Swiss-Prot record:
Glycosylation sites: N61, N155, N256, N280, N315, N421
Protein name: SVP1-like protein 2
Listed GO CC annotations: cytoplasm; cytosol; endosome; endosome membrane; fungal-type vacuole; fungal-type vacuole membrane; phagophore assembly site membrane
Keywords: Endosome, Glycoprotein, Membrane, Repeat, WD repeat
Keyword Repeat: yes
Organism, scientific name: Saccharomyces cerevisiae (strain ATCC 204508 / S288c)
Family classification: Belongs to the WD repeat PROPPIN family.
Basic and acidic residues bias locations: 424-435
Entry note about domains: Contains a beta-propeller domain involved in specific binding of phosphatidylinositol 3,5-bisphosphate.
Keyword check for Cell wall biogenesis/degradation: no
Length: 448
């Protein structure tokens, strides 16, 4: 007897993507999701629904749908960037709408020659990423382009942050700090290179219009292979890069382009689709198509005298064979690499609940590995130096998950009996020089 599920039945049982896109705001305090009939906004942690906007079909314009394919918030303000998407887009895919939720209307409209891939907002500028270019405008009722169009590789990764120059200066000069707008993107001319620029350094020529203004950029040779992903930290001092190979993650200084850290995700090739710095820049979270979440330690503490990270105290795990294989010409390079301090192989909690149904295991696994999520870090208002919890929001399954980074218990396997006054986790029993070990634990999850 054939007990296999019919192909048509398996196809019909596939879950439709819950969200068309997910994006966090500038400080990860909120995230927005795009839907086939509008968009929603949630508070990141604790998870609460803040806004739900539903668009209805137009009685006068039958060609106008309700789908929103992309959203981007401006901090926690009433301004939200919208791009059409879905089966019946509300707007064209090459049109950017700035929605004012306070006035309940569209306040700014920008049209382009190609589809919009990403949008970044600040109180000063609007940065629009297209298929092969970047266009930058003033944030005003009638937006004006502030510099020439920037060329990037097809579907190149771009990141943009607004920060204060005090993060790049000593305390003696912090009184004269100013606002910086750092943008990073892959070079269109040289493979493996990225360009970093500060929009506040745009130079205008009185004899030329603003569109011909010069934007000074610095070039960083990051990888040999094409750039896959570029991410800036919130302070604008570091930029993380990875190539299409997906084995190495490198972190550079945006100030002088020097290499700060190099981390190894793994040995085999992977598609890294998400990276995110922690609020104070001490850690970097990385996700690939293998659905393994890695946490890399960039530095441990901040030097309070200069307000700069202490990279000398950074730690990370090493390969188990590093201390057993002597250095030589035949020793693989990856043995000397710095690995993540902890990682977790992610699983969809809804699919896990149906593991007893063996007929659906393959379908569930395939759906999960095709799913993509965004990372947002949680920050304790009472202790802003503590970066130990983060949130994942999955696009297709609509799952919200919170993970925490915990120190592993150091147990002496040779000791099985303890006195009444002795704790199982006594810091005094920790061996001198023994590295601290960490683990990622899922604290909670919820279906949105």
């Amino acid at each position: 007897m054939d007990v296999r599920r019919p192909i048509r039945e398996a196809v019909n049982n596939r879950r439709k993507p819950k969200f068309l896109s997910v994006s966090f705001n500038q400080d990860d305090s909120c995230f927005s999701v795009a839907l086939e009939n509008g968009f929603r906004i949630f508070n990141t942690d604790p998870l609460t629904s803040k806004l739900s906007k539903t668009f209805k079909e137009s009685a006068t314009n039958q060609s106008r749908g309700t789908g929103i394919g992309y959203t981007r918030m401006l901090y926690r303000t009433n301004y939200i960037a919208l791009v059409g998407g879905g089966k019946r887009p509300r707007h064209a895919l090459n049109k950017l709408i700035i929605w004012d939720d306070l006035l309940q209307k569209e306040t700014i409209t920008l049209k382009f020659m190609s589809s919009i891939k990403d949008v970044f907002l600040s109180r000063i500028h609007i940065v629009v990423v297209l298929e092969n270019t970047i266009e930058i405008f003033q944030f005003q009722t009638n937006p004006q382009r502030i510099c020439p169009i920037l060329d990037i590789p097809p579907n190149g990764s771009v990141d943009y942050v607004v920060c204060s120059s005090k993060h790049l200066q000593s305390q003696a000069s912090q009184s004269q700090s100013k606002i910086l707008e750092i943008i990073a993107f892959p070079s269109n001319k040289c493979v493996g290179q990225i360009q970093v620029a500060d929009l506040s350094q745009i130079k205008y020529n009185s004899q030329n219009p603003k569109e011909s203004a010069l934007l000074p950029t610095s070039i960083i040779k990051a990888h040999k292979n094409p750039i896959k992903l570029v991410r800036l930290n919130r302070q604008g001092t570091m930029v993380a890069t990875c190539s299409v190979q997906g084995t190495l993650i490198r972190i550079f200084s945006t100030h002088n382009g020097t290499l700060i850290k190099e981390f190894r995700r793994g040995v085999d090739k992977a598609d890294i689709y998400e990276m995110s710095f922690s609020p104070n820049g001490s850690k970097l979270a990385v996700l690939s198509n293998k659905q393994t979440l890695h946490i890399f330690q960039i530095f441990e503490t901040t030097n309070t005298e200069t307000n700069t990270p202490d990279h000398s105290r950074a730690n990370g795990s090493s390969h188990p064979l590093k201390n057993y294989i002597p250095k030589g010409l035949w020793r693989p390079k990856y043995l000397d690499s710095v690995w993540s301090i902890c990682n977790a192989h992610l699983k969809n909690p809804i699919f896990d609940a149906h593991r007893n149904d063996n007929s659906g295991d393959v379908t569930h696994d395939n759906e999960f590995y095709k799913d993509r999520c965004r990372i947002g870090w949680c920050q304790d208002s009472n202790n802003r130096e503590q970066d130990d919890s983060l949130v994942l929001v999955w696009q297709n399954s609509g799952i919200w998950e919170k993970f925490v980074i915990l120190e592993k218990e150091q147990q002496d396997s040779s000791k099985t009996h303890y006195s009444l006054n002795e704790s199982l986790r006594n810091e005094d029993t920790k061996s001198a020089g023994e590295p601290t070990r960490w683990e990622l634990v899922r604290e909670s999850w919820r279906e949105l």
